[in-house]
C-alpha cells in the first residue's frame, strides 16, 4: 500500500500530496461526497471507522523508499484526520513520521478539540485548518444540523485561534458554503486566519446567489489583506451570468 498520493481533479486545489487515514467518518455531514467517490455504502462509511490496515508503517516505508522530503502533505480528503469519538493516535503517529522525515502537514478537520492535542508536533511550516461552512447563531455552540456529529463551530474556531497563538499557519476551508452571511462575517472578524479557501455547494440545491456571494467575499478578503483562494467552480459563477437567487 502507498498511502501518500497525488490528488486529482478538484482535490488538486488543496495540495500536492495527501493521505486518507481512516476507512470512514462519523460526522455525517449531509453534503459529504466521500461515499460516492469511494463507492461505499453511505451508512457503513459513517458507522465503520477505523484506521486503514497498516497505514502508519506504510507511510513510513513509502517516505523512505521514495525519499519524499520537504513536501506539504494534506490530511485528509475522504475522511477527517480526527474522527470525533474515536482514537486519533494513528493520526498523531503519521504526523510524527511526516515531520521527522523533513516534510510538513496540512490538516483539515471538523474536530478542533482532538486536533489541538497534536499542536506540539507542528511548527511554522505546517498548516492547521478547519471546515467552516457558515452557521446559524443557535448552531454555534453545538454540532450543526448539517454536520450532526462534528465539533461545534465554536470549538473549531477556538482550536484555530490556539494554533495561531502557537505560531502555526491557520486556514479555513469554506467549502461548501451553507450560510453566506455568516462566512462573510467570519472573514471580517476572525483575524487569526492566514488563508481562506472558498467554494460553492455542489451537487445539492442552494438558493445562494454564488456570483454575489463570491464577489462580496473577495471584497472582504482584499480589505483584510488576507490570503485567499477561490475554488474554480465558484470563480466560474463569479465570472458568468448572474443567476436568480438570494444571498
Model-derived features: positions:
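Conserved AdoMet/S-adenosylmethionine-binding subsite of the radical SAM
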Residues: 54-223
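N-terminal [4Fe-4S]-dependent radical SAM core
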Residues: 1-72, 80
